[in-house]
């Protein structure tokens, strides 16, 4: 037995049937098929040790003269991948929003109905809602990719505006009854940035002063030997 997997295990029945139906010596009656041939016909061998041809997710290339990577699994591509890539390319800041990816039993998608819009029970609004809504519009209402994207995107913008208005009104109502809110994340980030800038400015001023003093001391330490060289030349001329 050769190394690796057995490639011909799935063709045992076909080969045995062909061998039984073929006469090696002409003139003799056909050979009796083996007893196990009927059993293997009804119960084929398992393909645990075989290497089946993987499912192709893309049409074959007619220009290819010789098939390559015949037994290599192809890339798994879903229709949502391209829609998701387009949305987050146009809305990169949506990736900065916190996401909740915890599910109860992994089958939460059964309770979602994208025909009713982007708001779904138990799922916060996110870019994935736009992707699933766009896919539903393309498959069920016959819209093109761009038409479904525009419709889902406008619905998403309206819901985001409503969320911002609700949040702003809630803050105003809380302040009306004496609520106090600390610094938001933007203010804290600006303060940290200003603090870092002032620290860098102080260091840069000190560093510039140090470099200027080093440059000035470099010129003051240079000894002028031109007068000494001229006197030596005069002595040599006098001796000659």
From Swiss-Prot:
<keyword id="KW-0496">Mitochondrion</keyword>
<comment type="function">
    <text>Component of the mitochondrial ribosome (mitoribosome), a dedicated translation machinery responsible for the synthesis of mitochondrial genome-encoded proteins, including at least some of the essential transmembrane subunits of the mitochondrial respiratory chain. The mitoribosomes are attached to the mitochondrial inner membrane and translation products are cotranslationally integrated into the membrane.</text>
</comment>
<protein>
    <recommendedName>
        <fullName>Small ribosomal subunit protein mS23</fullName>
    </recommendedName>
</protein>
<comment type="subunit">
    <text>Component of the mitochondrial small ribosomal subunit (mt-SSU). Mature N.crassa 74S mitochondrial ribosomes consist of a small (37S) and a large (54S) subunit. The 37S small subunit contains a 16S ribosomal RNA (16S mt-rRNA) and 32 different proteins. The 54S large subunit contains a 23S rRNA (23S mt-rRNA) and 42 different proteins.</text>
</comment>
<keyword id="KW-0689">Ribosomal protein</keyword>
<dbReference type="GO" id="GO:0003735">
    <property type="term" value="F:structural constituent of ribosome"/>
</dbReference>
<dbReference type="InterPro" id="IPR016939">
    <property type="entry name" value="Ribosomal_mS23_fun"/>
</dbReference>
<dbReference type="GO" id="GO:0005763">
    <property type="term" value="C:mitochondrial small ribosomal subunit"/>
</dbReference>
<dbReference type="Pfam" id="PF13741">
    <property type="entry name" value="MRP-S25"/>
</dbReference>
<keyword id="KW-0687">Ribonucleoprotein</keyword>
<comment type="similarity">
    <text>Belongs to the mitochondrion-specific ribosomal protein mS23 family.</text>
</comment>
């Amino acid at each position: 037995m050769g190394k690796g997997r057995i490639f011909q295990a799935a063709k045992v029945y076909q080969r045995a049937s062909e061998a039984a139906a073929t006469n090696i010596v002409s003139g003799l009656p056909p050979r009796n098929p083996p007893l196990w041939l009927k059993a293997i016909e009804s119960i084929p061998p398992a393909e645990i040790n075989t290497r089946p041809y993987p499912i192709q997710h893309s049409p074959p290339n007619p220009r290819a003269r010789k098939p390559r990577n015949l037994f290599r699994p192809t890339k798994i591509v879903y229709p949502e991948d391209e829609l998701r890539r387009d949305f987050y390319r146009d809305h990169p800041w949506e990736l900065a929003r916190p996401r909740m990816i915890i599910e109860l039993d992994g089958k939460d998608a059964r309770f979602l109905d994208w025909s009713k819009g982007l708001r779904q029970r138990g799922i916060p609004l996110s870019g994935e809602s736009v992707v699933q809504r766009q896919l539903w519009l393309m498959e069920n209402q016959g819209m093109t990719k761009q038409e479904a994207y525009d419709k889902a995107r406008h619905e998403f913008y309206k819901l985001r505006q409503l969320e911002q208005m609700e949040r702003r009104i809630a803050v105003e109502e809380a302040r009306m009854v004496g609520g106090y809110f600390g610094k938001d994340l933007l203010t804290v980030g600006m303060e940290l940035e200003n603090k870092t800038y002032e620290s860098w400015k102080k260091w840069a001023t000190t560093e510039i002063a140090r470099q200027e003093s080093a440059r000035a001391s470099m010129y003051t330490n240079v000894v002028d030997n031109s007068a000494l060289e001229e006197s030596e030349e005069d002595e040599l001329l006098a001796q000659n």
